[in-house]
Swiss-Prot record:
<dbReference type="GO" id="GO:0005634">
    <property type="term" value="C:nucleus"/>
</dbReference>
<protein>
    <recommendedName>
        <fullName>Heat shock 70 kDa protein 4</fullName>
    </recommendedName>
</protein>
<dbReference type="GO" id="GO:0009408">
    <property type="term" value="P:response to heat"/>
</dbReference>
<dbReference type="GO" id="GO:0016567">
    <property type="term" value="P:protein ubiquitination"/>
</dbReference>
<dbReference type="GO" id="GO:0005829">
    <property type="term" value="C:cytosol"/>
</dbReference>
<dbReference type="InterPro" id="IPR029048">
    <property type="entry name" value="HSP70_C_sf"/>
</dbReference>
<keyword id="KW-0963">Cytoplasm</keyword>
<keyword id="KW-0067">ATP-binding</keyword>
<dbReference type="GO" id="GO:0005524">
    <property type="term" value="F:ATP binding"/>
</dbReference>
<dbReference type="GO" id="GO:0140662">
    <property type="term" value="F:ATP-dependent protein folding chaperone"/>
</dbReference>
<dbReference type="GO" id="GO:0000325">
    <property type="term" value="C:plant-type vacuole"/>
</dbReference>
<dbReference type="GO" id="GO:0005739">
    <property type="term" value="C:mitochondrion"/>
</dbReference>
<keyword id="KW-0805">Transcription regulation</keyword>
<keyword id="KW-0346">Stress response</keyword>
<dbReference type="InterPro" id="IPR018181">
    <property type="entry name" value="Heat_shock_70_CS"/>
</dbReference>
<comment type="subunit">
    <text>Interacts with CHIP. Interacts with HSFA1A/HSF1.</text>
</comment>
<dbReference type="GO" id="GO:0009505">
    <property type="term" value="C:plant-type cell wall"/>
</dbReference>
Length: 650
């Protein structure tokens, strides 16, 4: 529970391509805009020669710096380097990914002139820090507690890794909840007043990078997830890619040139395509104009909504398959679905809406909640509930989540014996008794798997441990109780106990899956602090540089001013001019100097200019006509000017 004085708890939708943050305030959810005024923030982190950028600033410079701009960290989090999906993704990314210790994928970038490696958790933690800062700027107070969302499809290790990212960012992650569940909460709150009896709601979440379909029942504020399905690799980016490929071909036809080898050209084209896609959701055609795209050739073209739909038709149709699977899993007919809820920016595409509406025989779709914000909205509500913030309005909302995959262990012959079937409401606990397979067997190997296949080799091994010290006995005699226990965050504990001897062993499914150790997390928390300090150091530097620049240019303008120039002694004027020229020249050559160097230069310049200007004012006598008022735009002596206050400001 959130202690008092920790500020309100926030809800964060940590997305593959964009993230969003909300907070419960004044009896409602507030989705918070960032410093650029955007209510969603790109999940991008960029490293440059001089600084680290997160969010819009990172995404905006991606064309200039593609190899050191990291995005899609969510596609790596909690996975192994050898995972086929990591290998497939790797080929599409401009940044480099290598295998680190324990097969953990590490992202390689150049930062401040040296090579650095970051895990997906660290990159995600930087995005989380950004989201937290956005909330803190809005609330005006520190934020410690958060609810963070993940796709329903995420397995145990991906959930753990997301939690770790929270820890590294300095947040207390009160709970990890499924994105569709969060959207359902947002929706349930909207609809609560009118609802009577049980409602079946299908949540169709087509985001930038992932696609989730979930079926929930909502009754009197109780949400239950009946089934989930989806595709971890389908989303807005895929639609962008289709358009990019289309235009790459067009460029080839028109200009006989292939731009695929040029990351910057591709990136500029992709940015234009993303913009065009958004436009085509509200207009029938749009133009793309990119100056000097490749080898000085301008690329001007148009695309119609019909053409965009044709390029993506197979993908749009593919979106309907998980809908059918979800209904099958929940043993429900599509006519029993009361509401179909759209989540994720890509659900704005008219064709997607039309296909979905046709599938549900013309049923109206729920679009009352901004699809980009629904998940963060629900997370913010959940955060309010968990921290006891909200009023009666939210307190009686209860949330039942489910396991996305069946959990079980391997029994003789490589058979998957399921203890917890998929779509079981969590938290949950199941026990089952097993025995030995051969006479006098001294121990058993408990191998924990997740997956839907009958044989363990086709499923995903979560972890294993041994229970030894079983006294000699004929096969089938010893009784070994195996217990599977999943908590509210979907984190699994498996224990085994030999009934006769009381021998016990257990595993928390975390470490064997590339989970970060305590030490690693500690180290990363310190790194995060270090980067924050560096970022602040950099800001200090920039501020000091700007102060010096402003002072020099203001002073130059001051002495150009007729009224003032006429009062200046020629030698003094020359002295000031030379000093300013020298300062500006020094600035040009030392853009990356340290803050104190800028400050020293500033003091030098001031100690020369200020006395001269002050003398001029005193010499002018009372009849100079409001000389006092000149303070506003002249860098006057002492503390009147913008300059000397630097140390006090920081």
């Amino acid at each position: 529970m959130a202690g008092k004085g920790e500020g309100p708890a926030i809800g964060i939708d940590l997305g593959t391509t964009y993230s969003c943050v909300g907070v419960w305030q004044h009896d409602r959810v507030e989705i918070i805009a960032n410093d650029q005024g955007n209510r969603t923030t790109p999940s991008y982190v960029a490293f440059t020669d001089s600084e680290r950028l997160i969010g819009d600033a990172a995404k905006n410079q991606v064309a200039m710096n593609p190899t050191n701009t990291v995005f899609d960290a969510k596609r790596l989090i909690g996975r192994r380097y050898s995972d086929p999906s990591v290998q497939a993704d790797k080929s599409h990314w401009p940044f480099k990914v290598v295998s680190g210790p324990g097969e953990k994928p590490m992202i390689v970038v150049n930062h401040k002139g040296e090579e650095k490696q970051f895990s997906a958790e660290e990159i995600s933690s930087m995005v989380l820090i950004k989201m937290r800062e956005i909330a803190e700027a809005f609330l005006g107070s520190p934020v410690k507690n958060a609810v963070v969302t993940v796709p329903a499809y995420f397995n145990d290790s991906q959930r753990q890794a997301t939690k770790d990212a929270g820890v590294i960012s300095g947040l207390n992650v009160m709970r990890i909840i499924n994105e569709p569940t969060a959207a359902a909460i947002a929706y349930g709150l909207d609809k609560k007043a009118s609802s009577v009896g049980e409602k079946n709601v299908l949540i169709f979440d087509l985001g930038g990078g992932t696609f989730d379909v979930s079926l929930l029942t909502i009754e009197e504020g109780i949400f239950e997830v009946k089934a989930t399905a989806g595709d971890t690799h389908l989303g807005g980016e895929d639609f962008d890619n289709r358009m990019v490929n289309h235009f790459v071909q067009e460029f080839k036809r028109k200009n006989k040139k292939d731009i695929t080898g040029n990351p910057r050209a591709l990136r500029r084209l992709r940015t234009a395509c993303e913009r065009a896609k958004r436009t085509l959701s509200s207009t029938a055609q749009t133009t793309i104009e990119i100056d000097s795209l490749f080898e000085g050739i301008d690329f001007y073209t148009t695309i119609t909504r019909a053409r965009f739909e044709e390029l993506n038709m197979d993908l749009f149709r593919k979106c309907m398959e998980p809908v059918e699977k979800c209904l099958r899993d929940a043993k429900m007919d599509k006519s029993s679905v009361h509401d179909v809820v759209l989540v994720g920016g890509s659900t704005r595409i008219p064709k997607v809406q039309q296909l979905l509406q046709d599938f549900f025989n013309g049923k109206e779709l729920c679009k009352s909640i901004n699809p980009d914000e629904a998940v963060a909205y629900g997370a913010a509500v959940q955060a309010a509930i968990l921290s006891g913030e909200g009023n009666e309005k939210v307190q009686d909302l209860l949330l039942l989540d489910v396991t996305p995959l069946s959990l079980g262990l391997e029994t003789a012959g490589g058979v998957m014996t399921v203890l917890i079937p998929r779509n079981t409401t969590i938290p949950t606990k199941k026990e089952q008794i097993f025995s030995t397979y051969s006479d006098n067997q001294p121990g058993v190997l408990i191998q924990v798997y997740e997956g839907e296949r009958a044989r363990t080799k086709d499923n995903n091994l979560l972890g294993k441990f041994e229970l030894s010290g079983i006294p000699p006995a004929p096969r089938g005699v010893p009784q070994i109780t195996v217990c599977f226990d999943i908590d509210a965050n979907g984190i699994l504990n498996v224990s085994a106990e030999d009934k006769t001897t009381g021998q016990k062993n257990k595993i928390t499914i975390t470490n064997d899956k590339g989970r970060l150790s305590k030490e690693e997390i500690e180290k990363m928390v310190q790194e995060a602090e270090k980067y924050k300090a560096e970022d602040e150091e950099h800001k200090k530097k920039v501020d000091a540089k700007n102060a010096l620049e402003n002072y020099a240019y203001n002073m130059r303008n001051t002495i150009k001013d007729e009224k003032i120039a006429s009062k200046l002694d020629a030698a003094d004027k020359k002295k000031i001019e030379d000093a300013i020229d020298q300062a500006i020249e020094w600035l040009d050559g030392n853009q990356l100097a340290e803050a104190d160097e800028f400050e020293d230069k500033m003091k030098e310049l001031e100690s020369l200019c200020n006395p001269i200007i002050a003398r001029m004012y005193q010499g002018a006598g009372p009849d100079m006509g409001g000389a006092g008022g000149m303070d506003d735009d002249t860098p006057a002596g002492g503390s009147g000017g913008a300059g000397p206050k630097i140390e006090e400001v920081d």
